[in-house]
Amino acid sequence: MRSAGLVALLAVALQAAEPVVIAHRGASGILPEHTRESKIAAHRMGADYLEQDVVLSKDDVPIVLHDVHLDTTTDVAEKFSDRRRKDGRYYAIDLTAAEIATLTATERFDHRTGKQVMPLRHPKGKGVFRVPTLEQELALIAELNRTGGRRAGIYPELKAPSWHRKEGKDLAGIVLPILRKNGYATQSDPCYLQCFEYAEVKRIREELGWKGSVIMLLGGNKGVDGTDFAALKTDAGLKGLAGLVDGIGPSLTDIIKDGKATDLIARAHKAGLKVHPYTFRADALPKGVKDVAEAARIIFKDAGADGLFTDHPDKVLEALGR
């Protein structure tokens, strides 16, 4: 556990550090999420970190995909109609990595209606985009860092580990060795590992021995695995998290209420935790916020965020004067 003196020093350091800009699924505000093209654009924009949501394929290959389902961002229903489950959905875990590689990725749409979720973004069905594996993405980022002359970090999320376990697969057990093999293993490496499930975060630290930076993601009240988010947001909950993780990732709705900053970040800093809220979208501003500049002021100056997940890294970087 951290001493009171160390926690106080961490709180001061957190407030002094320049905030990091995290490309949420890449530059997903202008290109289909988690595609190679989206990550290249985000890197060129200058994002500090590029996010990877990670799920498993049938043959245990980590895939960069936001959901365990494939039917909201690909043409899986057209190419593999026989893989539809009784609930009407198509799961990455039911296709091999080679099969997933044949799918065409597109802008997110409602799997029931086929309508694009964000109609003013990249047109659904336009262009040829693919779903990458984690290994492919890490290789891409390494090459972008080499040719771009700067080292952008990675920000992988273990998606639904308890669901994967029910399906007979150990997501973290497969992903962590790949991260280590690619040079992401310690606190000094530019990598934040994130997850919404408290039990899995605890397992990552205590059972799997992960020494790198970890962010505990916080949802509304209770997670599908039983994680009590409301309790974790209390002073006692934040203090308890400080002995396990490096920071928290709350929703922007917990940071901004009717155009005003809440006290969550200040309380987290007091506990010695970094705070990287999600997700800022320039085309869907928080309630009570008139533009990107005002949002940046509230999030970084008033609330004191140490970083921000955004679909529009270029706009956030501009607001920060970078």
Give the positions of each predicted feature:
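Sec-dependent N-terminal signal peptides
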Residues: 3-13
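Phosphate-group recognition and catalysis centered on beta-loop-alpha active-site segments
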Residues: 14-322
